[in-house]
């Protein structure tokens, strides 16, 4: 097939707004990181630290049986849940997402501000070659990948430091979107089962989104 020629890069507010509506894309980023380091993590808020909760503990005990029935080994479950726990702040954030509490106009002004556009141009200048490789491999325009990267993790500088197992198990236990988050928890456990990373390094947002593009575990697996 004839390969389509690349168009000159034009990072603009429009590119970032398009990126804000295209967050369902998967498979856009290669295994190698687009930036080499993450900004230093600040201490977690107290409500994002494990809090004793007997009902959560009982839920986890029952979940382990379901997880083993779906192929997760007892060894992986033991490693994954060591040091984890109920995170009340995760439930609070799930109830008060910015996308739901701000108007669309205010939200888009935040995620596609002039400083974000400027940062996007700089990020594209640094990583343009990698972004073009992604475009050639997956057919997703490099500018759109860069926009998603900026909206989701501020170009790799805000990838989150909340343990994914604690976050997804808390939300699965909470029940508002229990089935969805139990699926994310199972997928996260499969990531560990496959040896893709360690429990200590499996961190992300309060909702379990991970990495530069903040993919949830099931999207990572797709």
Name these PLM-found stretches.
Residues 74-222:
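Catalytic glycan-binding domains that act on GlcNAc-containing polysaccharides
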Residues 52-86, 90:
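Near-N-terminal "mature-domain entry" segment
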Residues 10-11, 15-37:
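N-terminal export signals
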Residues 1-8:
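Short, Lys/Arg-enriched N-terminal segments with co-localized hydrophobic residues
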Residues 29-66:
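C-terminal segment of N-terminal export signals and the immediately downstream linker at the start
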């Amino acid at each position: 097939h004839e390969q389509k020629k690349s168009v000159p890069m034009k990072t603009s507010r429009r590119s970032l707004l398009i990126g804000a509506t295209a967050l369902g894309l998967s498979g856009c980023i290669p295994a190698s990181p687009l930036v080499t380091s993450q900004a230093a993590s600040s201490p977690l808020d107290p409500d994002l630290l494990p809090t004793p909760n007997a009902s959560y503990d009982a839920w986890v005990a029952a979940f382990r049986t379901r997880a083993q029935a779906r192929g997760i080994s007892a060894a992986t479950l033991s490693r994954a849940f060591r040091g984890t726990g109920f995170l009340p702040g995760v439930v609070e954030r799930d109830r008060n997402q910015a996308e739901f509490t701000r108007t669309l106009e205010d939200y888009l002004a935040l995620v596609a501000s002039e400083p974000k556009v400027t940062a996007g141009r700089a990020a594209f200048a640094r990583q343009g070659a990698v972004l073009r490789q992604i475009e050639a491999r997956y057919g997703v325009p490099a500018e759109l990948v860069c926009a998603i990267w900026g909206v989701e993790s501020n170009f790799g500088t805000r990838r989150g430091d909340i343990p994914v197992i604690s976050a997804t198990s808390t939300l699965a236990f909470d029940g508002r979107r229990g089935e969805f988050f139990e699926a994310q928890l199972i997928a996260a456990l499969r990531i560990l089962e496959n040896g893709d990373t360690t429990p200590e390094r499996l961190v992300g947002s309060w909702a379990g989104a991970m990495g530069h593009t903040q993919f949830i575990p099931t999207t990572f697996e797709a």
